[in-house]
């Protein structure tokens, strides 16, 4: 798996409503990147940390603003690791939390 895809970075902002309750507002920002498979070593390390890794997205570092979630299709995932490769690219490792 190494192909271009469209995906959304999920930006969250917290606001208080009229009753004083804090609510989270999500904004979905469309981006394009290259989807890659996870190496076996990365898969096992993530599993040991309680994560179910799903893949890696390589995208422009200029378009990434420390978002914690990514949406691919209808599924939202946590970004559990970010790697800047020293150029203008960033690798976003994403997956699901296992258990509680």
Specify the residue positions occupied by each region the protein language model found.
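Extended boundary segments
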Residues: 1-34
């Amino acid at each position: 798996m190494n192909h271009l895809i469209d995906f959304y970075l999920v930006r969250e902002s917290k606001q208080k409503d009229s009753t004083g309750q804090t609510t989270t507002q999500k904004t979905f920002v469309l981006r394009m990147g290259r989807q890659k498979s996870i190496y076996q070593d990365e898969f096992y390390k993530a599993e040991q940390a309680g994560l179910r890794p799903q893949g890696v997205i390589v995208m422009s570092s200029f378009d990434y603003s420390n978002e914690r979630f990514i949406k691919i299709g209808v599924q939202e995932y946590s970004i559990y690791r970010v790697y800047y490769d020293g150029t203008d690219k960033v690798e976003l490792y994403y997956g699901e939390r296992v258990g509680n």
